[in-house]
Amino acid sequence: MPYIKHIETKRISARTYYGRFCVLPLPAGQGITLGNALRRILLGDLVGFAATSANLAGASHEFDTLPGIRESVLEILLNIKQLVFKQISSRPKDTNRFAMRASLNLTGPATVTAKDLVLPSWMKVVDPSQYIATLASGASLEFEIQLSQGSGYRLRRTSLVPPGFTLPPPRDPLEPENDSKSETKSKSKGKSKNTSTSDVQLADTDVNAQIIDTDSNSTETEKEAPHIPSMRDDHMTLHIDAVFFPVTRVNYRVEEEVINGRRREELVIDIWTNGSLSPRKALDQAAVILIRMLASLQAPPPLLIEPEKKPTTKTIAKEIALTPIESLDLSVRSFNCLKRANITNVGKLIAYTRQELLQLKNFGTKSASEVVDVLNSRFKLALKGEEVTDQEQVVNQPSSQIATKKGARKKVNRASRPIDSKETRRSRNPVKSTASEVPEKMLRKSSKTKVKAPKSETLPKPSKSANLQQAEESLQVPKLRRKSELSSSQNPEET
């Protein structure tokens, strides 16, 4: 696996930094390939800052001179071109890329250097002592520099038209010409080629007369002509060739050596920078740019269209567990008790047992049964330690089997009991109760004893007539009542 070995780094001057690095080990033949690629990127693709234009007060063009200043405008622009700028902190987000400016306003006598420039807070000049101009006493120098960020070398924008000048709109070729022009063209076509000398002289006199007329009316034409900005405008922008190269020079050489019987190569790179970037950072940025460039040549990964995920049992169970208890339509008492105990969803509710719920304040058996029924009917769930009961099977099964399943005592159907309700007693004995009721009550107590049926069999539901017959056979109440009626009819005085 190749790695970078740092050999040395030193500062030669304020605007010159030097560094030497070695990349090893490399397979045979790869040293020159990698070295050439890194060299081209270091010299051409790294980003830097440079001055692209300047506005000098009182300068109309680059060959102009300013009073009281030793250097001409051209020499000042060349000195500004050599300024090296460096970013020292993060750049504000709202700063436009092409809105970076540096300004200067100084009055002589003085020597203008780079430290006199007013720069943004996140930039500085690499060499503050770099010379710009010399001012005599009473002379002033005021200019504004526009800075840009880029890579490589950018030529200045040249324009022969001064700023503010507008050209007339182009004429439509399909538009017909004026009648006067067409007449003159037709007359010139009709004339013969052989013209006399007198005609030529007349034509010359006409031209001279026209020139005299234009000279006499020159004041009127100057007023009517549109204003063209003068080349000696104080606010004219002078463009500069921008040099963004942070790396000024790169050399490399390939050295061979034998490691474990195999021939390997070492790439030695020498880098010189202008001070805005260290040689080590320049090499790191070049490696990143080379990797991105080669990565774009790779085949794109296949586009995988993932199928829509169907809801599984886990997702359904999670949705049920997160169901709030407000949607269970519980009674106000049950809901308030659960809410007070911080039981907010179904998942927390089924984590409780019935006994734990009954221990909650104001939570009784009715509330517990209500909660169990709602969980069973809506979600087929039960409390902790209980099983889910199938309601359809419970409805279809007879009561005896349900009692045996639950471990309760098996009860005989109420229809098989002797019926002795108040209505039957009133129909049988319309007369008021007598002393014969005492044995009747005793008989009733004896009749209320429950008859235990075998566990494997269930008693059939008897009809109404069979119930009456069984009641008459088991109880002798009607016979006793008849005897009392006969005795009362024979001896009415005793009654």
From Swiss-Prot:
Keywords: Chloroplast, DNA-directed RNA polymerase, Nucleotidyltransferase, Plastid, Transcription, Transferase. Residues 170-237 are annotated as: Insert. One of its GO terms (molecular function) is protein dimerization activity. InterPro entries: DNA-dir_RNA_pol_insert, DNA-dir_RNA_pol_RpoA/D/Rpb3, DNA-dir_RpoA, RBP11-like, RNAP_asu_C, RNApol_insert_sf. GO terms for cellular component: chloroplast; DNA-directed RNA polymerase complex; mitochondrion. Its EC number is 2.7.7.6. Its main location: plastid. Residues 159-227, 391-495 are annotated as: Disordered. It catalyses: RNA(n) + a ribonucleoside 5'-triphosphate = RNA(n+1) + diphosphate. GO terms for biological process: DNA-templated transcription. Residues 207-219, 391-403, 464-473, 486-495 have a biased composition (Polar residues). CDD domains: RNAP_alpha_NTD (cd06928). Residues 317-495 are annotated as: Alpha C-terminal domain (alpha-CTD). Residues 172-186, 417-426 have a biased composition (Basic and acidic residues). The keyword Transcription regulation does not apply. Disulfide bonds: none annotated. It is found in: Plastid, Chloroplast. Gene3D superfamilies: 5' to 3' exonuclease, C-terminal subdomain (1.10.150.20), DNA-directed RNA polymerase, insert domain (2.170.120.12), RNA polymerase, RBP11-like subunit (3.30.1360.10). Residues 444-453 have a biased composition (Basic residues). Residues 1-301 are annotated as: Alpha N-terminal domain (alpha-NTD). In plastids the minimal PEP RNA polymerase catalytic core is composed of four subunits: alpha, beta, beta', and beta''. When a (nuclear-encoded) sigma factor is associated with the core the holoenzyme is formed, which can initiate transcription. DNA-dependent RNA polymerase catalyzes the transcription of DNA into RNA using the four ribonucleoside triphosphates as substrates. Belongs to the RNA polymerase alpha chain family. The N-terminal domain is essential for RNAP assembly and basal transcription, whereas the C-terminal domain is involved in interaction with transcriptional regulators and with upstream promoter elements. HAMAP family: RNApol_bact_RpoA (MF_00059). This is DNA-directed RNA polymerase subunit alpha. The gene is rpoA.
